[in-house]
A protein has these predicted regions:
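Class I S-adenosyl-L-methionine-dependent methyltransferase catalytic core
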Residues: 1-183
Length: 183
């Protein structure tokens, strides 16, 4: 597993040996960031405008990829000890990488919504819906925030009340749901 783009391209990332952590593949990350970069260009924005939140961060590969591509800051929410150990090691070479050791279904309050949220919860545990609702309640997102949720293809994409789907992409056995908060 490695960073696939930006100034840290090719940097190898440490991954835990446990079965619980399932990093987003290099191919899916590369596709995701091609989509995000295109979206930013259409909205006349740059990566340097973006505060990125990687929820259920695991190794931190997605949030670190955002930093490698020039994001202003990446925040990581993780509470699984083996994943945290890898995340801390992987993030050590990056400025503006901030780890929040917390349960994403009960995040801390913030008064500063982020621009992009990526969420890759353990499959079939119904955690992403709870986390999305909690992030909304605790101030992490607003109508401008783009949310990407990685789920297994067989999972239903029933968004919590107050959110709408803007895109849905399949990558092997995984899907990426792109959504926003209703205005």
């Amino acid at each position: 597993m490695r960073i696939v783009g930006g100034f840290k391209r090719g940097k190898n990332l440490m991954t835990p040996t446990d079965e619980k952590t399932r990093p987003t593949s290099d191919k899916a990350r590369e596709s995701l960031f091609n989509i995000l970069t295109s979206m930013l260009m259409r909205e006349d924005k740059n990566w340097s405008d973006i505060v990125f939140l990687d929820v259920f961060a695991g190794t931190g590969a997605v949030g670190l990829e955002a930093l490698s591509r020039g994001a202003k800051e990446s925040l990581f929410m993780e509470n699984h000890p083996p994943a945290l150990k890898c995340l801390k090691t992987n993030a050590a070479d990056f400025e503006n990488a901030h780890i929040l050791m917390c349960d994403a279904t009960c995040p801390p309050f913030t008064t500063r919504p982020v621009q992009i949220i990526f969420m890759d919860a353990p499959y079939r545990e119904e955690l992403w819906e709870k986390a999305l609702t909690a992030l909304k309640a605790k101030g992490w997102l607003d109508e401008e925030t783009l949310i990407i949720v990685e789920i297994e293809n067989s999972e239903e994409n029933i968004l919590p009340a107050g959110f709408h789907l803007t895109d849905d992409r399949s990558y092997g056995r995984n899907r990426l749901l792109f959504c926003r908060l209703n205005a």
